[in-house]
């Protein structure tokens, strides 16, 4: 029991219960290597919108509550298609896998954003706020790509969308 608890603590973020980024990279890399011909997967880097102002206004307790609520949306996605992790601070990542077409990845990512859009969090007795995140999407293509290339491409797409607007995702070009 103790060994299992320690293993969990070494691989999961203590605040959100999501995988730590290091574990995510390991598991996502395994998923990419195991993919069969004709399969595609997507890597999504996510950054919470307006998190700094929430943390400044409602303190660390409010910020932590916001992070946990966002993580609960990530955890609500079907695990046979989603691998989720907290990268650091207000940055998260997920892998959408087990898909035959890019359109399936888009379907699952759009579903995630729909669930997120419908989620509000009560930050004080009189104030609730929708949870919002910007995302960058990269997917496996015709070229053999490593998990590190996919993460880098998803990061580039994230920075692109953050420059333009908030609350949605864009694909790596």
Describe each model-derived feature in a short phrase:
Residues 86-87, 116-133, 162:
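Catalytic core regions of nucleotide second-messenger enzymes
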Residues 95-97, 138:
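Short hydrophobic/aromatic beta-strand micro-patches
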């Amino acid at each position: 029991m103790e060994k299992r608890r320690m293993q969990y603590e070494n691989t999961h973020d203590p605040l959100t219960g999501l995988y730590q980024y290091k574990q995510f990279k390991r598991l996502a890399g395994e998923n990419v290597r195991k993919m069969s011909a004709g399969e595609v997967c997507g890597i999504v880097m996510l950054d919470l919108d307006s998190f700094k102002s929430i943390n400044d206004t409602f303190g660390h307790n409010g910020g932590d509550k916001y992070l946990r609520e966002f993580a609960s949306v990530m955890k609500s996605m079907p695990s046979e298609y989603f691998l989720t992790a907290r990268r650091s601070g207000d940055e998260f990542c997920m892998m959408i896998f087990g898909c035959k077409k890019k359109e399936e990845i888009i379907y699952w990512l759009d579903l995630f954003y729909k669930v997120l859009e419908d989620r509000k969090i009560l930050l004080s007795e009189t104030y609730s706020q929708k949870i919002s995140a910007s995302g960058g999407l990269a997917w496996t293509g015709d070229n053999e790509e490593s998990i590190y290339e996919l993460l880098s491409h998803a990061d580039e797409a994230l920075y692109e969308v953050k420059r333009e607007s908030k609350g949605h995702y864009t694909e790596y070009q």
